[in-house]
């Protein structure tokens, strides 16, 4: 169908585009959205005195799966580590100089900042309209500098998902420095160093974060912070996978090897889904989470069936729009949840299956409509020049082509950032 392709087509800004990675992003964003969707009904019904009866085995299974949805953020961190490190790793293996830091930062700013600022303005307007008494402009000013969570800690912040974006920015700034590890010529030394760093960062994460204070599925032992340290291990996993991917061909002609990676991917997913409950008892949960994410990341690149499924148009389309979905999903979930709350409260499992999960999926799909407007234009690395030309020439067609994700002639012109 031509219409959906035109509407949702992404505009990859890199020749290293891997559709299966976007497919993996789709799993991460669905996990996060469903976690927030189920969490809304869980908290509201606890406040109403519901969910007091003994749960069935089915209820427990659904709760077990949904309670791990917040780990989609850690999967995003691992994906970011992989995507940002891969160009550095490939250039190092080819004997080329690393990407220019100025161009690297400029690209992060022009790609990531505009949708974030749009979302920040959206939540500021929503706060003024919905809860003007709790609106604090200073919080949004801090959010504009990716520093809100470092200075404020209260429940009036509508843009609560911004905490992970602030941590992502911290990693973006130091990723080129960390990527100097790829200049080491010995694979054993490179990967050994990364492995030791992952273990050390994981140990720090375990000691820092094993302090659950909220009821499941909203909190528990794995609490997030405001700075990169507790999350660094997940980014480093992505860097380790990038190093392996830069030296080992991702596709294997051996069917048995590919099948083994399919199995490894499933095993990794099960480890991730088991890690949360394990965290209640010991730091073994952090280990399970780290190993699970490593198997999921590498299995996505090396498997056959899983890789093929993730690279399909629908998963890669949803994953390509995950930034838009992540930025804007909290408020639609709260609005729809308020409307649907009277339909819930009898049984946790049925509430999740019949209301929370369908609502989360519906919000995810509906937010795809925002993607061409708030994100896709900025995936073209030359959008600032295109916008200037559109204003000078009064050419609305240039803006429309940016929204449609079509490359412009300027993409072939030399620029200062290239």
Where are these regions (language model features)?
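Alpha-helical transmembrane segments of multi-pass integral membrane proteins
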Residues: 231, 235, 239-240, 262-376
């Amino acid at each position: 169908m031509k219409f959906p392709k035109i509407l949702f087509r992404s505009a990859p800004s890199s020749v290293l585009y891997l559709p299966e990675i976007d497919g993996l992003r789709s799993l991460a964003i669905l996990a996060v959205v469903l976690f927030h969707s189920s969490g809304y009904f869980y908290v509201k019904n606890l406040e109403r005195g519901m969910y007091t009866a003994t749960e069935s085995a089915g209820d427990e299974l659904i709760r077990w799966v949904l309670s791990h949805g917040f780990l989609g953020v850690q999967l995003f961190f691992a994906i970011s580590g992989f995507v940002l490190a891969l160009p550095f790793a490939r250039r190092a293996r080819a004997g080329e100089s690393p990407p220019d830091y100025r161009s690297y930062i400029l690209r992060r700013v022009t790609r990531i900042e505009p949708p974030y600022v749009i979302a920040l303005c959206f939540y500021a307007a929503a706060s003024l309209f919905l809860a003007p008494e709790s609106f604090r402009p200073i919080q949004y000013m801090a959010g504009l500098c990716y520093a809100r969570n470092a200075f404020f800690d209260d429940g009036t912040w509508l843009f609560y998902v911004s905490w992970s974006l602030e941590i992502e920015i911290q990693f973006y700034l130091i990723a080129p420095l960390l990527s100097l590890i790829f200049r080491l010529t010995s694979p054993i030394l490179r990967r050994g160093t990364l492995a030791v760093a992952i273990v050390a960062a994981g140990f720090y994460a375990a000691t820092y974060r094993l302090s659950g204070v909220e009821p499941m599925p909203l909190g528990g032992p794995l609490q997030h912070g405001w700075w990169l340290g507790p999350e660094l291990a997940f980014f480093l996993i992505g860097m380790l996978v990038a190093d392996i991917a830069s030296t080992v061909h991702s596709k294997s002609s051996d069917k048995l090897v590919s099948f083994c990676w399919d199995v490894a991917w499933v095993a990794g997913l099960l480890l991730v889904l088991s890690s949360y409950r394990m965290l209640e008892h010991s730091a073994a949960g952090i280990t399970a989470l780290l190993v699970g994410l490593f198997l999921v990341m590498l299995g996505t690149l090396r498997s056959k069936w899983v890789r093929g499924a993730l690279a399909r148009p629908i998963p890669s389309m949803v994953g390509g729009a995950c930034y838009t979905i992540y930025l804007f999903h909290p408020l639609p979930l709260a609005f729809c949840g308020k409307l649907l709350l009277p339909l819930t409260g009898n049984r946790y499992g049925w509430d999740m299956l019949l209301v929370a999960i369908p609502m989360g999926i519906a919000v995810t799909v509906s937010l795809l409509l925002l993607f061409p407007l708030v994100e896709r234009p900025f995936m073209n690395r030359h959008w600032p020049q295109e916008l200037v030309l559109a204003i000078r020439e009064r050419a609305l067609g240039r803006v429309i082509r940016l929204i449609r994700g079509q490359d412009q002639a300027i993409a072939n012109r030399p620029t200062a950032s290239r």
